[in-house]
């Protein structure tokens, strides 16, 4: 499915690059693993090739898909106001999907809320994490400049 050198997004971890595909033996069973270098933390993650679909890992979007995300970010409607506990769960679930659109919605909605009132500690952390995940993916989009990333975020 993925090749060495592919830029990917791993939900709740951000973007990374597949550095290798290695065979490892664990409990007497040999398996192929994707070796992924994560952009945010510089950590290395190994995921069995057979579990790649269930992990929701996806390729980094291209610059054309980014224009749609920008529209959602700038002009999309915010979700209805929920009690903070429900809102936190909804936002966390959106980020866990790994979809850039959902992550952008979380950032947009929390930034809009922040303009009206202070965010609580868990919402601040969620906003910070979602922002880091988004920027880590934007940095790997081919054809995008640092100036464009800064203007988007």
Model-identified regions with their sequence ranges:
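Charge/polar-rich, low-complexity and marginally structured segments
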Residues: 50-153
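A positional/architectural concept
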Residues: 1-55
């Amino acid at each position: 499915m993925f090749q060495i050198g592919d830029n990917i997004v791993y939900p709740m971890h951000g973007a990374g690059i597949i550095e290798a595909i290695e065979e490892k033996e664990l409990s007497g069973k040999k398996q192929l693993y994707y070796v992924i270098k994560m952009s945010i933390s510089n950590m290395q993650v190994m995921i069995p090739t057979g579990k790649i679909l269930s992990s929701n890992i996806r390729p980094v979007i291209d610059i054309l898909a980014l224009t749609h995300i920008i529209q959602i970010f700038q002009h999309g409607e915010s979700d209805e106001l929920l009690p903070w506990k429900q809102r936190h769960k909804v936002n966390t679930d959106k980020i866990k999907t790994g979809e850039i659109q959902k992550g952008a919605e979380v950032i947009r909605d929390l930034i809009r809320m922040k303009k009206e009132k202070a965010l609580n500690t868990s919402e601040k952390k969620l906003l910070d994490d979602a922002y880091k995940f988004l920027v880590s993916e934007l940095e790997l989009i081919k054809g995008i400049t640092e100036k464009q990333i800064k203007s988007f975020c």
